[in-house]
Regions:
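Membrane-proximal intrinsically disordered regions of secretory-pathway and membrane-system proteins
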Residues: 1-431
């Protein structure tokens, strides 16, 4: 784990949302569009002056540093409001402590001149990942069953990014419930926090590079309960073979062929399992074992392809044989209504999984270059990839009737609850 990043996200949101302001959120923000556009023009010119000053003095000018901090904090408040991560209407000055989604920013300090000189070029990878997390303008959503390779066999595709997809789904949920689902709020907060770190790096507030690890960015956020589908593995193993990294795609071809063939059989099996679960109220044990192996294999396969793990995976999806493994529940009773409407209920989760897929591709793309140079994967990118794979595995497990617990979209791993002496009601996850 790296040392604490100087730019930290503060989350003091209570999840309550006003239905009226949620419905008209984009219209209510029109004055802010104008203000941030004007402020951004000023920041462009001020950043040039700050670059020259920092290059000459070895540290940023205090007055310009305060100006940049106010701008970054204001942009964070506005993004949180627009993407339903926060509820109150934000102010226009970027004052610290005035909004439930806030930032702690470092005071001006020494910065390396060589890093300052090449800042715009060094920032490009972080800006690429930030763009993918927020999404491409004009992006859309769709969800489909997919029998090809990748991180989820039932997945969505989206050019709209994690933050935008979470806001899109959260908009409907907030109108119905008057509350933002915690998982979606956490996902949006993560993307906004990474964007703030990227902006702070670009505008010379700090020379510490943005850190993509979700756990680091959401330290102040309470983790959800442990989902019955979760990943396990050695968090400290970042070693990557340069040779297999370079030839990762050709090496993956046998797994691609096998995954396609297994996916066809899995679709037939889940069709039969749907009827069994609908009438018996629980899945057939033999089909459950077959589909569990398939879902676990899909995770191993994607972890290898996207450089989240290093060894070449096996072809059988057996538990305990891969560094990044998947814990799956035993067959148990499932709600018949959830079973009957499973395909439709899975669509929101598939949309979000598709949005996370863009981040997974970007993280793998950047990891490929770093791993070739260093022989190891960046911890932050590896943890972001693990988050995307974990959520995709939960979507798969839900679609393939391994559990009727809905996927939880929080980037945080679940927290272990206290031991229970008596069985309790199964936890309900709303995204």
């Amino acid at each position: 784990m790296q040392a604490r990043h100087p730019v930290q996200l503060v989350v003091e949101d209570d999840l309550h949302r006003s239905r009226l302001t949620v419905f008209f959120r984009l219209l209510l923000a029109i004055p802010h569009y104008i203000w941030i556009a004007l402020w951004s023009v000023a920041v462009f010119f001020v950043s040039i002056v700050q670059w020259a000053y920092t290059l000459a003095a070895g540290h940023p000018a205090p007055a310009l540093h305060r100006f940049m901090c106010s701008y970054i904090r204001y942009a964070t408040h506005l993004e949180a409001y627009l993407h339903l991560v926060g509820n109150p209407y934000p102010g226009f000055t970027g004052e610290e402590g005035e909004y439930p989604i806030d930032l702690t920013l470092p005071p001006p300090g020494p910065q390396k001149r060589v890093v300052t000189f090449f800042r715009i070029f060094l920032a490009l990878p972080a800006l690429l990942l930030n763009t993918v997390l927020f999404g491409v303008p004009g992006g859309g959503f769709n969800a489909r069953a997919n029998s090809r390779g990748g991180n989820a066999s039932f997945q969505g595709s989206s050019s709209s990014g994690l933050v935008t997809a979470a806001a899109f789904l959260g908009w409907f949920a907030s109108l119905v419930q008057g509350r933002m689902p915690k998982g979606l709020r956490d996902a949006g907060a993560y993307g906004i926090g990474y964007g703030a770190q990227s902006l702070a790096y670009l505008l010379f507030v700090t020379d510490r590079y943005p850190y993509a690890d979700p756990t680091s960015l959401l330290q102040a956020v309470e983790p959800p309960a442990v989902h019955p589908v979760h990943i396990v593995g050695d968090a400290g193993d970042l070693r990557r073979s340069r040779l297999t990294v370079f030839f990762r795609l050709p090496l993956w071809i046998p797994h691609f062929v096998w995954l396609v063939l297994w996916s066809i059989a899995a679709l037939v099996a889940v069709f039969l399992q749907w009827w069994v679960t609908l009438f018996a109220g629980r899945p057939a044990a033999a089909l459950h074992r077959f589909l569990s192996r398939y879902v676990r294999y899909a995770l191993h396969n994607a972890a290898y392809l996207f450089l989240t793990a290093n060894p070449f995976p096996g072809f059988d999806g057996a538990p305990g044989r891969y560094p990044l493994d998947l814990v799956l529940p035993e067959p148990g009773r499932q709600n018949r209504w959830k079973t009957f409407f499973r395909l439709f209920l899975a669509i929101p989760a598939a949309i979000l999984s598709g949005a996370l897929g863009g981040s997974l591709f970007a993280a793998a793309f950047l990891t490929w270059f770093v791993a070739l140079v260093r022989g190891s994967a960046p911890e932050g990118l590896r943890n972001l990839s693990a988050y995307a794979l974990r959520y995709a595995a939960q979507v798969n497990a839900y679609f393939y009737l391994l559990t009727d617990v809905y996927p939880h979209s929080s980037p945080l791993e679940g927290a272990e609850s206290a031991p229970e002496s008596e069985p309790t009601a199964e936890p309900q996850y709303a995204w």
